[in-house]
Design a protein with these regions (language model features):
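Compositionally biased terminal segments of proteins
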Residues: 1-130
């Protein structure tokens, strides 16, 4: 898979470069999720959902909001989750850069900074809010 070519397609459709990169990162994560054992245990939330419903470029978002159902949010579990997504034979790997705790008024979660890298070493930085 060539991430740069996918970015170029979205850019030609009118997305700004950073939004095109974010969209490709989201597409990769969603594809990997849909083909993983976690597909029935994760809810996609936030701007990704709104953008896909409205198809409005104004709704484009940089991060991906996920809600894990009956899955631990400790760092080892998050590393295992990403490791499982990386088992797909798509020549795209997700590398965790950093994990930080999130404390919101109604819940605690994690922000996972990741780098999505293709076989040509083209990469996109994004983050997952879990």
């Amino acid at each position: 898979m060539n991430l740069e070519k996918f970015v170029e397609i979205y850019y030609k459709q009118g997305y700004e470069l950073n939004s095109a990169q974010a969209k490709v990162a989201q597409d990769i994560i969603l594809l990997k999720l849909s083909e993983s054992k976690y597909k029935d245990n994760i809810t996609i939330k936030g701007g990704v959902v709104m953008h896909n419903i409205s198809h409005s470029m104004r709704r484009a978002t940089r991060d991906i909001d996920l809600d894990f159902i009956k899955y631990s949010l400790d760092n080892n579990s998050i590393y295992n989750f990403i490791e499982t997504l990386n088992k797909m034979n798509d020549n795209v790997q997700i590398q965790i850069e950093k994990i930080i705790a999130l404390k919101h008024e109604d819940y605690n979660g994690k922000r996972v900074y990741v780098k999505i890298i293709d076989k040509y070493n083209y990469y996109i930085d994004t983050k997952l809010d879990i």
